[in-house]
């Protein structure tokens, strides 16, 4: 600290801030990076390369969705809260990925602790690549981790939109940490790691692209948060509902289009392979989004006598 304080322009508070950031910077440089265990691996097949490359591209699209979420939320809120929402979306995704790397992935895909209910494989994500993975044209653990971590971040971002303009930055960060490190991974293990949802009598539970694991978990968490926090300030005056228009619908519209693009990573990428079903899923995603936009336009025109951009988004 004495060295930092000796530098011109550094106050005591700034010196403490830089010292606090040092461990995180070291982690980013690779001090805590877990390297794969070396073993003799077979030759990489075309299918193996295609599957992993496709999932990596899909992961980038899913991560890019966070820009869409941030723009939709910021554009639909009041101007005074826009900076808080943007900061929240950016930081929470970084926090979610770190929490999922530290313990979340292990809780979701680890070994059974309580059969069907709880799994754990130790702290920190293990990136070990095996010969079997390559021979079966499977996914490299690091690629699979990145895709799943992007899903975890999405679950937290869903909640962010539902409690927008209702919660302070610090409190939401704590909640997002608990959600992405424990709640989401445990719920995900119930289906994607052979948990109890796979053995409910004769009924087969199928979750494609996180319909329940990501979106339902995020939605339920957001609903509880909205109920506990109550309505936004100014939403009700003398018991009457007041419209709170967004301050920048251009940004919100652009965010919606970015989300549309991101869905081509979220849904087709959930095939976890480059196969014949990927284009089919992409077409279904396109028609679903188009149908939703058309339906919202028609309904808002009937109820409000004119199209409502907020409803279309």
Residue ranges and their predicted role:
Residues 2-313:
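Hydrophobic alpha-helical transmembrane bundles of multi-pass membrane proteins
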């Amino acid at each position: 600290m004495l060295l930092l304080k000796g530098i011109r322009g550094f106050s005591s508070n700034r010196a403490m801030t830089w010292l606090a950031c040092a461990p995180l910077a070291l982690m980013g440089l690779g001090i805590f990076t877990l390297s794969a265990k070396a073993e003799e691996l077979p030759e990489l097949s075309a299918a193996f390369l295609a599957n992993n490359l496709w999932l990596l591209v899909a992961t980038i699209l899913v991560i890019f969705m966070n820009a869409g979420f941030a723009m939709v939320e910021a554009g639909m809120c009041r101007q005074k809260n826009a900076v808080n929402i943007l900061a929240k979306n950016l930081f929470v995704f970084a926090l979610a990925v770190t929490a999922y790397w530290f313990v979340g992935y292990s809780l979701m895909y680890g070994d059974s602790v309580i059969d069907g209910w709880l799994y754990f494989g130790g702290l920190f994500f293990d990136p070990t690549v095996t010969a079997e993975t390559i021979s079966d044209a499977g996914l490299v653990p690091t690629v699979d981790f990145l895709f799943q971590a992007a899903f975890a971040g999405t679950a937290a971002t869903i909640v962010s939109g539902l409690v927008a303009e209702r919660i302070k930055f610090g409190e939401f960060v704590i909640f997002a940490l608990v959600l992405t490190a424990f709640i989401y991974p445990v719920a995900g293990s119930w289906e994607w790691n052979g948990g109890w949802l796979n053995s409910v009598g004769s009924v087969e539970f199928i979750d494609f692209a996180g319909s329940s694991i990501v979106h339902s978990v995020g939605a339920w968490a957001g609903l509880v948060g909205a109920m506990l926090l109550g309505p936004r300030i100014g939403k009700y005056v003398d018991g009457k509902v007041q419209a709170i228009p967004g301050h920048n619908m251009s940004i919100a519209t652009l965010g919606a289009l970015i989300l549309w693009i991101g869905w081509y990573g979220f849904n087709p990428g959930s095939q976890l392979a480059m196969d014949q079903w990927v284009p089919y899923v992409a077409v279904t995603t396109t028609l679903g989004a188009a149908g939703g936009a058309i339906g919202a336009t028609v309904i808002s025109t009937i109820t409000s006598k004119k199209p409502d951009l907020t409803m279309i988004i």
